[in-house]
């Protein structure tokens, strides 16, 4: 309140000074400023009062400029000092008025504020000297009224008020002055105390803002001080500061001996860089050449052979499609095309191991079954069929389904077109070449799709194994699907060899499971299946339980499909694998629908069989090939129609029933598998070899399958290519998972089949070995569970096979012994352990070479299994 009033009074001062009653006005003006109350004391203005006012004036002058500029920083308004000045010049009102203005100017007060203040006092006076006198809004005209009102000679009243207020004002001002001058106002007050002196003000400003040069000097001094102090405490610092160490080159620092090696190292590094650049350039050139070749080949194929594709393929390729007869009648040079595509794929992969490892290792299981299917048929028949619409259909549909799983339909159309264009061996291969990146992606992803794509494409060429089997068995189909599939599988196998990631192992396992699943349908289809089931690991694991092996492989197959479709398998752990599972689900659904819709169309063509394997591979990855193989075996010449029928059945069974088959599958597959069980065992051993790539246990089985020298050789090759480190790492993980799954499976089996303890015991041992095969594939360990349950049933049906398989499982321990010796020893051991809860443990030990894995599993699983048996 005081602030506002004082300001108003100060502004009103000029008007007051002009009037003759300046004294009176000053006194009332003061009274409102402090109390705003007029007391009825009729005392005239005293000399003491005048002195006090003068003193106040001085104090205000000292603070006036600051307060006015600060906007009454301390509650004292700048006008009040002005008023004080006016009072001091009681004798000469005019002089006081003039003085006030100069002060205002000196203080740097702005006129507008001054006007506002005058308004407020005038307003307060006009209203009867309102207590606040804070109405700044009143027009300036009120100033005259305010002057007149105070002009009334109420000098006594106003004089007394002024005296009283003077005292109060004095006290207040003193306090405020002290407050104003306090140190914490340093920023504002010191510079403004003497604002009247412009020079001083400028000096203050200069002091406040130091010039850059001065700041630089100060900073230098500060740093010097710091350094001098630091050097005293730590003299070593001085050397660094004052004599900064000069950087020495590596050559100067090294001794002569080291220097020489360093130079050599640099040279090697440079050479490497140059070589890498050259390699990159060469690779790029090769890729360009390959692309050109592919384009040329595709163009030639398109021109030579009209596109003849399955209904799905036709949808995408209607524009290119011409006549199916052309494709069938014109036989493309599949071998040459396939070779070209293989070369291209290998160069793309740029893997040190190249195709040999992938062939031996990734394609064996599946492709052997594929070859066996075709083997049932005369290879010549299959070739023409494959070359004809059949191959094209299979490749196109497979491509389409694969793409449906992994890629958009447009891509599938492109792949289908490539397949149709390349038709026959080349068609499938061109598809892989086209799909080359896709296959690689799938393989890298460790997706089930990759395995499926591989199955579909690998039909034609097995690279290592399939070539061996497919040459005699199914050249065209095997080559065709194997070509594209081979590349993907080889990529996968190489990845597995490198053991870059579990996902790779998983994908490899998926592939192996695919082979197993292929075997399972073959086993289901009986002896003809046995021929195809040669590569199937599951039955190799449980040769004694041919049915179990089949059911296992089937369940594995189902496992693979469900795991991919439903994300049950451990491979789902990887997001990529989970995505693969989703893709598989879509592929299975599409494949089932296409199978149902196109079964009739495909039955007319052998290509339908290929399509089905492609579709099935896409759906369940391995199941489709399995189903296809069995049918091929049943009606070798009529592979297409049987495959369609079987395919229609299997796709439906794969997702839902395969799981059931895993758990209860033995009942269904075992019957069909029983006849094929023994044969499957032999053929399965090769697949065991295929699995051996994944785990030594599988390798042992493959050795046991030395009976099938072809497969065993193939197995040995890829196995040798694999490094022990990778094997042990993947084996340990696989064995751990497999052991856990085995435990669960054994528990389930014991609970379900406690009624038949002895057969169960037999099954359990064979199961572990078999499970081992599956579990050797890290990705498939969990999937192995369902096969064991079928295995338990299987052993009763095929107890003889179990001993054989046991021998195969033991193979790792006694690789140098004869198969017969090992078989006998293992058989006797198994019989001894049949009723013992430690049977499973023994089997596990037999199949494993990894000491760590053996110890770990022996301790945990032996104890747990014993408890379960109890």
Curated annotation (Swiss-Prot):
One Gene Ontology term from the biological process aspect of the record: actin filament organization
Query: Which Pfam families does the UniProt record give?
Result: AKAP2_C
| Signal peptide segment | none
Does the keyword section mention Lipid metabolism?
no
The compartments listed are: Apical cell membrane
Q: Which species is listed as the source?
A: Rattus norvegicus (Rat)
Q: Could you tell me the membrane topology recorded for this protein? A: Lipid-anchor; GPI-like-anchor
Q: What is this protein called?
A: A-kinase anchor protein 2
């Amino acid at each position: 309140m005081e602030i506002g009033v004082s300001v108003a009074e100060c502004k009103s001062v000029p008007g007051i000074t002009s009037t003759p009653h300046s004294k009176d006005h000053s006194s009332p003006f003061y009274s409102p400023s402090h109390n705003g109350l007029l007391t009825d004391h009729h005392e005239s203005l005293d000399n003491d009062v005048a002195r006090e006012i003068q003193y106040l004036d001085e104090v205000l002058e000292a603070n006036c400029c600051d307060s006015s500029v600060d906007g009454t920083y301390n509650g004292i308004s700048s006008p009040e000092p002005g008023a004080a000045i006016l009072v001091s010049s009681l004798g000469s009102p005019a002089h006081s008025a003039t003085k006030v203005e100069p002060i205002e100017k000196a203080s740097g007060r702005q006129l507008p504020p001054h006007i506002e203040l005058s308004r407020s006092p005038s307003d307060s006076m006009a209203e009867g000297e309102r207590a606040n006198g804070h109405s700044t809004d009143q027009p300036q005209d009120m100033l005259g009224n305010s002057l007149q009102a105070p002009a009334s000679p109420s000098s006594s009243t106003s004089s007394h008020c002024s005296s009283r207020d003077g005292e109060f004002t004095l006290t207040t001002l003193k306090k405020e002055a002290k407050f104003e001058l306090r140190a914490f106002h340093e920023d504002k007050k010191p510079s403004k105390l003497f604002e009247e002196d412009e020079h001083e003000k400028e000096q203050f400003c200069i002091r406040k803002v130091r010039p850059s040069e001065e700041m630089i000097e100060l900073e230098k001094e500060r740093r010097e001080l710091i350094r001098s102090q630091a050097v005293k405490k730590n003299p070593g610092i001085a050397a660094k500061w004052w004599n900064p160490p000069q950087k020495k080159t590596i050559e100067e620092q090294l001794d002569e001996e080291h220097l020489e090696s360093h130079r050599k190292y640099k040279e090697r590094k440079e050479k490497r860089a140059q070589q890498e650049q050259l390699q990159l350039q060469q690779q790029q050139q090769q890729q360009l050449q390959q692309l050109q070749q592919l384009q040329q080949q595709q163009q030639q194929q398109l021109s030579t052979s009209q596109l003849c594709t399955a209904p799905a393929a036709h949808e995408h390729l209607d524009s290119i499609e011409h006549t199916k007869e052309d494709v069938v009648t014109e036989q493309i040079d599949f071998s040459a095309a396939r070779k070209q595509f293989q070369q291209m794929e290998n160069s793309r992969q740029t893997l040190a191991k190249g195709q040999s490892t992938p062939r031996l290792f990734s394609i064996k299981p599946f492709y052997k079954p594929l070859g066996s299917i075709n083997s049932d048929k005369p290879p010549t028949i299959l070739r023409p069929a494959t070359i004809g619409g059949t191959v094209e259909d299979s490749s196109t549909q497979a491509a389409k389904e694969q793409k449906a799983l992994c890629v958009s339909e447009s891509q599938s159309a492109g792949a289908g077109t490539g397949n149709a264009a390349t038709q026959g061996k080349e068609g499938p291969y061109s598809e892989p070449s086209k799909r080359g990146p896709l296959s690689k992606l799938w393989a890298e992803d460790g997706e089930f799709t990759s395995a499926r794509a591989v199955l579909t494409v690998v039909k034609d060429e097995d690279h290592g194994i399939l070539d061996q089997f497919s040459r005699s068995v199914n050249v065209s189909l095997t080559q065709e699907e194997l070509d594209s599939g081979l590349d993907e599988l080889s990529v996968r196998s190489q990845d597995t060899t490198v053991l870059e990631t579990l996902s790779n192992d998983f994908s490899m396992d998926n592939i192996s499971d695919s082979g197993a699943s292929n075997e399972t349908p073959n086993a289901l289809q009986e002896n003809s299946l046995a021929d195809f089931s040669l590569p199937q690991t599951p039955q190799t694991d449980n040769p004694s339980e041919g049915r179990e092996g089949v059911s296992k492989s089937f369940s594995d197959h189902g496992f693979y499909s469900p795991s991919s479709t439903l994300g049950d398998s451990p491979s789902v752990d990887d997001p990529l694998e989970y995505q693969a599972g989703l893709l598989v689900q879509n592929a299975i659904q599409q494949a089932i629908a296409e199978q149902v819709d196109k079964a009739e169309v495909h039955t007319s063509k052998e290509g339908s069989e290929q399509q089905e394997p492609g579709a099935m591979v896409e759906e369940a990855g391995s199941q489709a090939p399995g189903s296809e193989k069995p049918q091929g075996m049943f009606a070798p010449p009529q592979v297409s129609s049987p495959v369609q029928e079987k395919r229609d059945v299997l796709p439906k069974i794969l997702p839902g029933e395969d799981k059931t088959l895993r758990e209860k599958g033995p009942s269904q597959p075992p019957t069909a598998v029983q006849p094929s069980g023994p044969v499957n065992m032999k053929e399965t051993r090769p697949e065991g070899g295929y699995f051996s790539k994944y785990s030594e246990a599988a390798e042992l089985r493959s050795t046991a399958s030395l009976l099938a020298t072809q497969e065993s050789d193939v197995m040995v090759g890829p196995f040798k290519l694999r490094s022990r480190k990778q094997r042990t790492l993947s084996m340990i993980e696989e064995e751990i998972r497999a052991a856990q799954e085995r435990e669960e499976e054994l528990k389930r089996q014991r609970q379900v089949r406690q009624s038949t303890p002895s057969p169960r015991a037999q099954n359990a041992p064979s199961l572990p070995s078999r499970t081992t095969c599956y579990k050797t594939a890290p990705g498939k360990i969990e999937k192995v569970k369902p096969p064991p349950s079928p295995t338990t049933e299987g052993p009763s049906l095929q107890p003889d096979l179990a001993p054989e398989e046991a021998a195969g499982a033991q193979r790792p321990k006694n690789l140098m012994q004869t198969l017969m010796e090992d078989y006998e020893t293992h058989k006797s051991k198994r019989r001894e352990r049949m009723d013992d809860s430690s049977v499973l443990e023994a089997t596990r030990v037999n199949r494993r070479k990894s000491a760590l894995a053996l110890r770990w599993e022996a301790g945990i699983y032996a104890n747990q299994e014993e408890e379960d048996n109890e």
